[in-house]
Amino acid sequence: LALTSAMVLSLAACGGSSSDTKTSDDSKKASKSDVEYVQDKGTLVVGITDFEPMDYKNDKDEWIGFDADMAKAFAKSLGVDAEFVEIDWDNKVMELDGKTIDCVWNGMTLTDEVTSAMACTSAYCNNAQVVVVPSDKADKYQDKDSLKDLSFAVESGSAGEKAVSGEGYDYTAVSSQSDALMEVASGTSDAAIIDLLMASAMIGGGTSYPD
């Protein structure tokens, strides 16, 4: 598989917690309360998806990656252990509100929907949405107009889905970005829209998707 030069949307990544964002004073109170809650129970429960290179498992079935390592370091600073829970990305706000998880730490895009529903850190990573097609077809697709007749696979609830729906393209929503790549590799979909960070780690020579 290969990237095309058609960048769909520029984005930023963030970590999120607590849905109380009414005012700055309220946010400070909520933050203190949330920290005490986490410290009292001794664990920071982190909501993630399998999203290499941000969050993924090694051969020992341990969660590693840029975000996973940051979450572990943050939990250590609080004097607690980090516990990782795979979530349905569509349900991240519901999981937070129900206290099934304490935070979301998964290369999350700072959208109006996200920042209105939960308190977020400042963005610490620039990202983009990119189109992935079979490498033998990449030269055919270099602008938006060339993509309009393709069928896309995107992660449900992701920035990729927002981008493709905004363009009016035909698409199928799947449960994860890795599933979107599988759709393209199997020929079920013509292209996938995923994060540039994931695409850089998951496709090309030496990966599971070299072609």
Where are these regions (language model features)?
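Extracytoplasmic small-molecule ligand-binding "clamshell" domains
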Residues: 26-107
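Short Pro/Gly-enriched coil loops immediately N-terminal to beta-strands
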Residues: 118-131, 147-148, 176
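Short helix-initiation/N-cap motifs at beta->coil->alpha
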Residues: 84-95, 139, 156-157, 172-186
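A ligand-binding cleft/hinge motif common to bilobed small-molecule-binding domains
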Residues: 108-116, 163-166, 190-211
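Bacterial lipoprotein signal-peptidase II cleavage site
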Residues: 11-27
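Ligand-binding cleft/hinge of the Venus flytrap
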Residues: 56-60, 71-80, 144, 157-177, ...
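Flexible hinge/capping segments at coil-to-helix
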Residues: 133-151
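Alpha-to-beta junction loops
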Residues: 45, 79-81, 98-106, 150, ...
